[in-house]
Structures are given as structure tokens and as C-alpha cells.
Amino acid sequence: MSYNGGYGQNNGGYGGGQGGYGGRGGAGGYGGGRGGGYGGGGRSGGYGGRGGGGRFQDTRVELTTPEWDLESLPKFEKNFYNEHPNVTARTDREIEQFRKENEMSILGHDIPHPITSFDEAGFPDYVLNELKNQGFPKPTGIQCQGWPMALSGRDMVGIAATGSGKTLSYCLPGIVHINAQPLLKRGDGPIVLVLAPTRELACQIQTECSKFGASSRIRNTCVYGGAPKGPQIRDLANGVEICIATPGRLIDMLEAGKTNLKRVTYLVLDEADRMLDMGFEPQIRKIVDQIRPDRQTLMWSATWPKEVQNLARDYLDNPIQVTIGSLELAASHTITQIVQVVTEYQKRDLLVKHLESALADSNSKVLVFASTKRTCDEVTSYLRADGWPALAIHGDKEQHERDWVLKEFRQGSHSIMVATDVAARGIDVKGITHVVNYDMPGNIEDYVHRIGRTGRGGATGTAISFFTDNEKKLGGDLCKIMREAKQTIPPELQAYDRRSYGSHIRYGRGRGGRGGRGGWGGRGGGRGGGRGGGRGGYSSGSNTAPLGNRRF
């Protein structure tokens, strides 16, 4: 794979800082410290002083693509990889066998050999100590190959399933990268920029960055929509080495002059396929055009459709690629897939039946997918009235409520979460034992993505799907996915096989979900002795529905 990216000339460059930020102390890092500042003519303007409690002035400017002059830009270090003697000593046959065992395929030239342990990665002690403190037994497949790639300073593509350890694959090399750069000065933007499709994923990435960056005093902020801008603006003005952002809110900050990307030398596009599915391609391109072209760019994705390949060709320079598993669309073989062909009116009682079985184990967590926000609320209200500990999460919920719902679900205080696709994207909750497709998704890619929330990390899981005649065009693709995973296909579903309806599997963008259905007919008033509404200040709508007598 060879991507060509010729870059135009420029006459930009960094301006000098206006008064330095205090050093972070004790970072050590690669490449001999971070002493000198950037030279160059000083920036005019910069951030104006903010009087106590004063408002930020929001003067928007249209972003234009700079003309880059690489010769005038300050040099920076991005290759920190020194191969461990154990890695060097391995034969080509041993390396090939390791990659085969981990379903690892590579593409490109001069690709570093994979590592097999944390010590072989060559991380400094402050990173290794944190890894050991977190109790990770060994690197995942994507980390074994991704860390040497990222630490070598190369542009790279990493393709692996959600939940495979991609976040640490770029987070830890990013921390090493930061510690080798000069300190931020007043008015500087971040050094590492991570773009993510959803606020939930962005917040999860921030958690990992905070955890592993604390010992180096690396600051970060999370910039996303649906939350007040003030705290995000203050973080950016105070200076952060890492900015994790959703594309839309970051564009707002850039156009309002609240930050800049002149210092970014390490760019991450996480869940690139999902960002394109959600229509963020214009924003991504506008953002990346603001970053110096000799940066290091890392693209991470669960799939490799043509749209993502085109983005890689445009913005990655001679990249190397690692893929864990097959590029063919497939479901994990650790997931038991159960598909029931039903009518709309049968769904509610069948859901309760499956919940009774699933929650017989008190450690179970059940994620239920609904196609619309309305259905999501209706399912949740019914379940709560019937005594089930369910909470809803969707796009109409305020961010603080979404955070609370996720916390309750993660901790097991509420073992059922009902979600829409958009709300669930980027959510990584450990220990989900069951996924229920109350409504089928609009395309087979989303089906595989949904059920992949269970059966992670070698654990087993169960996916239950209610299939109606409205989804008959999905039948052939669904049979193909189940057949590949060696699942039992019910005769009722086989009637919808591709032999009758044709295959609709695509590897590009999804086709969008079905429109919402009308509401249920009500079922008389729940079971007596309701428990009152949700917790004050957090819950709204269906999440405040009284909880009936416990079903278990």
C-alpha cells in the first residue's frame, strides 16, 4: 500500500510564546528532555486577559487552509523506538507464527517486528509502572504490533474490533511523544489531538489519558458538544498537551479563536469509519488541513471501507498498516446468536422472557437496542413499571444524565440499559453478557457492531435479535453472518435467505435505520408499590418512571 500526499509550500511557522507555562517536572522521556522553546516571530494578539468571571468573547473567523513551508517550521522528534534485544533475536519464522496466532496481517514497507510483552515495547519506566499498576496481564494483539509502529514515528492504520485495546495503542506512544517535545507556551494549542465520533468515546479516551499521563503531569481536556463551552474554553486557554474532541465542537473552538492546532505533531483519528458514517468527513478534512503536514498521523478503525481508505490516501504519508482478524465483515465466534422471527406485538413479552433467563445470574448486564428514541423510552418505562432495573440512554438526554446512566450500568446498579445506535456508539462497558436487538438495525454492519458489545476479551456472550418481516432485505446478510460464525439458523429466518432476496452486505457506509414505529398499546398499570422516580437532578423522562416490585 502506498499513499502519496504531496504538500504545498507554505510560509507559516510558529510564533514565539508570550510568557511560558510552568514546566511539568520529572517527565524524563525520550530524546533528551524538552528544554528549548520555539523560535520565530511572536504571535500577535493571543489570548486576552480574562477578568474574574468575565465572559469569553466569541469572534468567529472562517478557517482557511494554511500554505505550509516545511523548511520554516520548527523541527520535532517522533521516532522513539529502539527494538528490544528479545525482539531482534526472533527468527522470521517465529515472527510469522506469532502474527498467525494473533490473526495479524500487515501491509507496507519496513514494518517493525511485533513485541510480546510490555517490557519489550521500550516504554519508559513511568509508563511501564502504570501498566503494571493497572493489572494488565499482557499486550493485546493490536498493541503488540501497534506500539512499535506508533513509537517509530510512522503514519499508520490500525484495524481491529471495538474493545481490542486500540485506545492504549495510541495513547501511550502519544504520552512518550509529548514528553520529547518543548514545553507549551502561552497561547499554544495541544501537541496531541485525538478526534472521536461521540462524546462518550471521547470521555473514555480522556480517562485513559488522565490515568497514564498523571505521572508526567500531562494535561488534557475533552471537547464535545452537548456540554457547556466555558470549562472547555478555560482548559484550552490554560494549556493542555492532549485535546480529545468530537469534530463539530472542535470546529466551533477553532473558528471562535479559542485554540489553534499549530503545535499538533501527533494526530489520532479514532473510529474513523464511525466518524464518516456520521457525516463528519467535511469537518475532519477542515481540521486536518489546519495541522502541519509533517505530523505523525494514526488512523484507527473497526472496518476498512472505501471512504476510510480515501481519507487515509489523502492525509497519511507512506503509512504502514496492521489488521487484527479479517477485513471481511464477521461476528465474533465467542457470541451465541439467537434470532427469532416475530411480529411487533410479540416483542415485549419475549423481551421479558429473555430478561428472566439472563438476569438469573446477578452479575449479568443486558444492553437492549431500539431503533428510535421514542421506542427506547417506551421500552424503559414498561420495564421499570414491571419491576426491571432499566435505564434509557439516547440523544435527547442531557450529558450529565447520560454519564449517570452509564455509571449505573457499569457498576451494575441498573443491569439493563436501553439505547439507540447513536447513543451507544463509542460506549465501552465491560462485562456485558447479553445484547438484545429489540429492533433490528438498518444494515448488517451495525448488526455486527451491536452484538460485538458482548463476548469481548475472550469472554462468551449472547446476542438475541427480534426479526420481523419489515427487515426481510436484511435476511440474506444475517444468514451469511450466522453461517460464517457456525450459528444455528432457524427455519423461519432461512426463508429470508439471500437465495430469495439477494445479498446486501456492503463495506462502505451504513444504510441508515428504519423510521420509528408507533407506540405500544399500554399494559395496565404495572405492579403495585412503585418505588418513586429517579434520582433528583439526573433522571428525566422514562428514567424517572416508578420502579415496580422486583422481578427477581
UniProtKB/Swiss-Prot annotation:
InterPro entries attached to this UniProt entry: DEAD/DEAH_box_helicase_dom (IPR011545), Helicase_ATP-bd (IPR014001), Helicase_C-like (IPR001650), P-loop_NTPase (IPR027417), RNA-helicase_DEAD-box_CS (IPR000629), RNA_helicase_DEAD_Q_motif (IPR014014)
Motif (Q motif): 116-144
Record's compositionally biased regions (Gly residues): 515-539
Residues at which ATP binds: 160-167
A Gene Ontology cellular-component term: nucleus
Taxonomic superkingdom: Eukaryota
Occurrences of domain Helicase ATP-binding (ranges): 147-322
Molecular function per GO: ATP binding; ATP hydrolysis activity; RNA binding; RNA helicase activity
Function: ATP-dependent RNA helicase involved nonsense-mediated mRNA decay and ribosome biogenesis through rRNA processing.
Domain comment (free text): The Q motif is unique to and characteristic of the DEAD box family of RNA helicases and controls ATP binding and hydrolysis.
Name by which UniProt lists this protein: ATP-dependent RNA helicase DBP2
